[in-house]
Design a protein with these regions (language model features):
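A generic structural signal for short beta-strands and their flanking turns/coil linkers
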Residues: 16-18, 38-42, 74-78
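A short, structured beta-strand/loop element
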Residues: 31-48
C-alpha cells in the first residue's frame, strides 16, 4: 500500500467522508530540503459531516490526529481542504 493509499484508507475510516481525494505531490518537491528525509508531500480534499461546528484549525487538528505518528515520520507536508457537505455544495465550480 502506498502512502497516499494509506492516508486515504485512514481518513475514510476516521471521517466516513462523502468526498475524499488524496494527491501525492512528492515528485513536485524532488530536491527540496524536506524531501531528503523521505517524507512525502500530499494534498487532501475531504468532505465530512464530522467537520460541522469545527473551525478550520480544529478540522486540521482532527485530520492530523487521525494520521497520528505518520505526520512526524512519513508525511513532510500536508495541504488540506476540509469541508462539510453544505460547504462543498456551495463551493464555486
Amino acid at each position: 500500500m502506498t502512502r497516499a493509499e494509506w492516508i486515504e484508507s485512514t481518513l475514510r475510516q476516521a471521517f466516513q467522508p462523502q468526498h475524499l481525494v488524496v494527491h501525492d505531490e512528492s515528485a513536485l518537491h524532488a530536491g527540496h530540503a524536506g524531501a531528503a528525509s523521505g517524507g512525502g508531500h500530499f494534498r487532501v480534499a475531504i468532505v465530512s459531516t464530522a467537520f460541522a461546528g469545527l473551525d478550520r484549525v480544529s478540522r486540521h487538528r482532527a485530520v492530523y490526529a487521525a494520521l497520528g505518528d505518520a505526520m512526524r515520520r512519513e508525511i513532510h507536508a500536508l495541504a488540506l481542504e476540509t469541508l462539510t457537505p453544505d460547504e462543498w455544495q456551495r463551493r464555486p465550480s
